[in-house]
């Protein structure tokens, strides 16, 4: 995080201290998180709008003004995109969220998606996927928060746990982290890809430790989840920042008839390269901006601005992508307007 944003952060802290909210608004380090649903009723709409997360949109809102005008002829731009997506891809996606910050110290909310697609096998109707990313243990996420995260994940009763990388802030934290996460037992196991932090340090140790605890690291590999004679595919991307080595997506050799979930650290990858045969991509890296005030994030970890900042988006090929805010932090242990979250996805088969 660059020094130029320190005045911005100071101004933000002063603003928060002056707010009238009396419920779960923390203005002191090390954990600074503000959720829209924690603003009391007498707080003005202006203040409430400052920190409103924009994760649950049904389309990428960075469309041209001309496209917006065309869409408004019959319906809103979001509805127009949703309708088009239903026709062209046989897909329907809805979302909701649950505030858990009063119960779990490590996570602020659970964001739930119902993902309906024509290629979901009948055996996987109602299949539940838990997705976490960017734990950065021990940054904002400390031991108590990690234990609470584990309790929350166990309570979700997921069928599989997927992880998006950037696990640690030091190699000494690798074993304690995965030892705790190993308590989360799911019928289909735990899969994970590496983040940029994990390639900078501790990569081999993370791979060994994951395998030691029965987890499955995916480095440009695919694995098959089987149930009642049917299957879905998990495709994991190795270092998505090195396109020279990894610019060929592991999904290219897969069948378009399979339901394929791509697991990748940065959302930019789904736009940088062809990810054909992918039905749903999951990514992290952006932290949802980590600090967002007046709808502005001073640091964007994407070459595409706010297009893939958080929540549901689409690449140019109209492949859906869910980007999580993640859980931990980098540089400074502060989150404002970008709540730490767990993603839960329930698969449904489109009945045509």
Predicted regions and their residues:
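Beta-strand-turn-beta hairpins that frame and shape the catalytic cleft
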Residues: 108, 117-130, 215-216, 223-236, ...
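Extended active-site neighborhood of metal-dependent phosphoesterases/phosphodiesterases
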Residues: 90-92, 97-102, 114-116, 179-243, ...
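Active-site neighborhood of phospho(di)ester-bond hydrolases with catalytic His/Asp-centered motifs
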Residues: 132-133, 160-166, 189-196, 218-221, ...
């Amino acid at each position: 995080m660059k020094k130029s944003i320190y005045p911005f952060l100071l101004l933000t802290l002063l603003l928060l201290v002056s707010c009238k909210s009396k419920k779960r608004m923390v203005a002191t380090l090390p954990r600074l998180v503000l959720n829209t649903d924690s603003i009391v009723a007498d707080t003005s709409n202006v203040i409430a709008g400052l920190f409103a997360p924009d994760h649950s949109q049904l389309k990428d809102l960075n469309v041209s003004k001309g496209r917006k005008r065309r869409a408004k002829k019959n319906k809103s731009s979001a509805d127009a995109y949703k309708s088009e997506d239903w026709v062209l891809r046989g897909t329907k996606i809805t979302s909701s969220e649950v505030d858990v910050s009063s119960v779990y110290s490590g996570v602020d909310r659970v964001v739930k998606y119902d993902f309906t697609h024509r290629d979901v096998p009948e055996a996987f109707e109602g299949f539940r996927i838990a997705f976490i990313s960017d734990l950065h243990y021990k940054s904002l996420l400390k031991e108590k928060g990690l234990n609470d995260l584990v309790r929350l994940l166990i309570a979700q009763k997921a069928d599989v746990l997927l992880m998006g990388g950037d696990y640690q802030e030091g190699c000494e934290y690798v074993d304690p982290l995965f030892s705790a996460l190993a308590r989360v037992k799911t019928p289909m196991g735990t899969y994970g890809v590496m983040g940029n932090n994990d390639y900078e340090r501790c990569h081999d140790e993370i791979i060994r430790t994951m395998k030691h605890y029965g987890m499955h690291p995916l480095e440009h590999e695919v694995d098959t989840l089987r149930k009642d004679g049917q299957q879905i595919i998990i495709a994991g991307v190795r270092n998505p920042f090195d396109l020279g080595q990894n610019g060929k997506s592991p999904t290219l050799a897969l069948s378009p008839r399979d339901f394929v979930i791509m697991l990748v650290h940065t959302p930019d990858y789904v736009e940088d390269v062809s990810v054909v045969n992918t039905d749903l991509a999951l990514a992290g890296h952006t932290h949802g901006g980590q600090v967002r005030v007046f709808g502005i994030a001073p640091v964007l970890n994407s070459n595409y601005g706010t297009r893939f900042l958080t929540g549901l988006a689409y690449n140019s090929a109209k492949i859906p992508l869910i980007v999580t805010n993640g859980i931990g932090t980098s540089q400074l242990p502060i989150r404002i307007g970008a709540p730490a979250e767990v993603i839960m996805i329930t698969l449904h088969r489109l009945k045509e």
